[in-house]
Amino acid sequence: MARTAPDFESLKASFPYWEKAGDMTDQCIDLMLNYRQSGHPGGSRSKVQQMIALTLSGAMRWDIRRPDKGLSDRFVLVAGHCTPLVYGMLAVYHEAMRRMFNKTGDDKYAIYGGAERTLTWEDLLTLRNRGGISGHAESEGKSMIFATNTGPSGHGAPTAAGMALAFKRAGAEEVRVFALEGEGGHTAGCHHETKHTAWGLGLGNFNYLLDFNDNGIDPRPYSSMVYGDPQEWFDSYGWRTRGVNDGADYAEVTSTLLENVFAEGDQPRCTWFNTVKGRGYGVEGYASHGAAHKPNSEIFWATKKEFADKYQIEFTGFGNAKPESKDDFKAQTAANLQEVMSLLDDEQFCEYLANRLVEIGDSVPSIADLDGFKLSTEDPYRDNALTDPANLPQEIYFDAGEMQPNRKGLANVAAYMNSVGREKYNRPIVIASSADLAGSTNIDGFMKDWGDQKGFGWYDRDTNVDGSLLPTTITEFSNAGIVCGLASTNMSDDPENNYVGFWGACSTYGSFSYLKYGPMRLFSQLAQDSPNRMGKAIWIAGHSGPETAEDSRTHFGIFSPGITQFFPRGQVIDIHPYEPNEVGPALAAALGCDTPIVALHTTRPNVEVPDREALGMSSYMDAAKGA
């Protein structure tokens, strides 16, 4: 199924509709924040034209009826605080779909999952309330458009890169990933790591959308602290970079976005947009970041007047103070949201919007439609050759009396696991990365030969995109994020019941575990929130504990490996093998559990493999039982 760029000239006729949808989104942002008195108006307002163009132009291939389709393009709101932007847009889109379904009864307008998956204007009244829509991006229920949970600075960027890698490695590089961020969030170090790695992996399907307005939270321009501009920030990393001078102009936004997204080549790309933080909100710059206008204040009503005059509507209580009772304030806000939605009384506009969303949704392929897709629809992770310790081959174990490090147990079971993938599924089970410590931590077993099965080798963007060991550098944070993004990418046509994708593994010193915690924490949340099946993230805490004492206390870390336990019950399994033969049984058993993260702590020095029978010890197979 070839993917061709939409015709820009044909799209231009729709820009008046896009402008109307964007104006409605602006009003939804303002009204929900006026009511809730919490949230982030500035960055939400500045990104409206980018989001409308992305979702209606065809640059992003997605289905509003089911955004979590396996081969849908992925959207990651790295600027996770800008959820009002997406909620407001979805409320407009879903209202058009609802009206067309009620008018025609045609199932093509029906949302998968019904009310539980439909974000309507009524839901805007629940912002930042318990059980309502979240203040930062969470991938669940009504907000499945978010491919992952985001909010902490930059955390979504490496995760998005991992998603792009999953599609590329599966032969589905035409499926794209879009990561929306501002230049403030972009200063986080994980962006530096992610940009290096995305270039090195040749992720031509990875797209940054950067909102550039020189403002953040504190009262100083970012240009006073950060040299250059987005063109330099991304060109210098080998990316394909294009800029938009007026980020509020639909023509310039759309033409530049399409030109950059559909360009050929394996360079990751960034499209940046020169915008005004707080555009149209009455307060611009840093002051618009995280505070709504006082409820029903004069400046709030001023932002409504322009819209009311433009579209000849009347807002309830216009110019008046906030109603005294909470119920009256809620009723007033609901009435005004309905007034915004009344623009969809224009049947031509409503039909255009709903039909355009359906048209784009219908373009999302199934696995059968995609030429060159490398994964079968069979879920190998249900294969007990991988998850039943009794099925592990004797060759992975060492004889009593041998001097071997625990990490060698990982090397053997890792090579065996991917040999099962080669033999049965013609693909690796696990894609691995390390912080320039692949051999040192023995995570390189995932790319090595096992028996008569040839290993998949090192990944190389030019010579071996089928490799199973990524050539990542000393980028612990982004390595963890990439592994989590990889493991969360379910390409199945039935993602709730079947997993088609990869497991991921990453390693560094156990004492540096804190560098990996942030992405793992969000992956744990995603696994809790999402109705879809996920893969596994295998967290190798290598060279762990005082056995690494020759590196001194800066490296052996008595307490920092405990970070792998900082998850809710049932979200992580920690493995601390006594000797190398315990690694295989314990790891296989853990991977067979319904737990998204498995943290394996291995040591570096050789230890003598015990003669368990002579010592009266139980079998190393008992390690599979856990503590």
Write out the residue ranges for each language-model feature.
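Conserved acidic/glycine
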Residues: M1-A53, G185, G189, N207-L209, ...
